[in-house]
Each structure stands twice: as structure tokens, then as C-alpha cells.
Amino acid sequence: MDRAALEEGARKILLTNLRQGVADWNGQAYSFVCPSLTGYPFQWFWDSCFHAIALLHLDKEQSKAELRTLMSAALPNGFMPHLLFWEMEKQPDFLSRNIVGQAGDPHYSSTMQPPIIAYAVERVYRATGDEEFRKAALPVLVNFYRWLRDVRDPDNDGLIAVIQPEEAGTDCSPKYDEALGLTEMSNRGVLAA
């Protein structure tokens, strides 16, 4: 496959999976690329970070919109959830097939994913030179990384504590089976993805 065909394939997937609208639950506009229209129709933290970087080659404005939408969900304490249910009507079906940690608010998860958002913001800023984007992002990022330091580094060793496998980006890894009480499933030859 040549580069032009690869770029066209990426463009088709990214723009087909673009979700835009206004959330019924908070009246906020959203614009993001979902990982899958059928299986994963919501906004995921690190997927959005990678989508924003990929979108730099296709649509720089959408690249910024992707991260703005993600950062708009940051809580006052700095926490940024790994999953945002902008379209709540799709949530019941998804939750019937998936386990998502939720505490309190049903519109987002109570867990996080690898904190790569600063890297994504930097890449988008360097590609666009958009000072307003950078200025708006910095307070959100500072608050998020302070939250990580204050809440997710209980022993002050500079390492973030992982509460469940998705937070490390190693979803469904067998290395967590014992800790999660799934030892009976470990050697059944089942591949879960």
C-alpha cells in the first residue's frame, strides 16, 4: 500500500468515526473521533490523544477540537476520566456488555488512562502554532498533572498508582488475572480482546 492510499484509508476511518453534537446532559458541544461506531461509540482519553495527533495530517482544526472536547470534561479537582458518554442514549447497551468503573456521575468513568495528553497538546500546538489553544490547555493540564501527583502517587515515589488494568493501557492483560481473582480463566486458551 502506498502512502496516498494509507492516508486516504486513515482519513476515511477518522472522518467516518467523527462524532459531533451537543450533549443532552450538560448542553456542551462535542467533537471527537470514536474508536468504533458500533463497539466503542464514546470518547476515550488516550484514543483522543492519538486521534488528535493523527488528525494533524488531515484536519488541524478537528485535531484541536478533539483535545478541547476531552479537556472540557476535566473536573474541578483536575481529574480527567478515561471514558466520556457524550451520547447517553448509547450508554445502556454499552454497559450491558462492558464493565466500567463509575462513581457518582453516570456521564463518565471514574478511572483514567495513561496520561499522554500533555504530549498530544504539545504536538498539536507545535503543528498549528495556535497560542490561544496552548493558553487554554495549560491550566487544564497543570490541574490534571497535579491531581495525578496528589491523588495517584500515595507513596510519593513519582510513579502513578494503577487501580485497574485500563489505567495502564493494558486492558485484558493476563498479568492482572491473579489480582482480579481471574486465575481460573488464565489457562483456558481463551483470548479476550
What spans do the regions from the language model cover?
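Charge-dense, low-complexity intrinsically disordered segments
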Residues: 1-4, 38, 57, 135, ...
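Hydrophobic (often cysteine-bearing) scaffold residues that line and stabilize catalytic clefts
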Residues: 47, 113, 137
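The feature captures the catalytic groove of carbohydrate-active enzymes
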Residues: 37-38, 42, 82-116, 122-126, ...
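Alpha-helical support elements that line or immediately flank enzyme active sites
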Residues: 47-78
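Alpha-helical scaffold segments that form or flank carboxylate-/histidine-based iron centers
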Residues: 47-50, 132-134, 143
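Low-complexity, Ser/Thr/Pro/Gly-enriched N-terminal "stalk/linker" regions
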Residues: 1-43, 64-65, 69, 78-83
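Hydrophobic core segments within long, regular secondary-structure runs in both alpha-
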Residues: 3-11, 15, 60-71, 118, ...
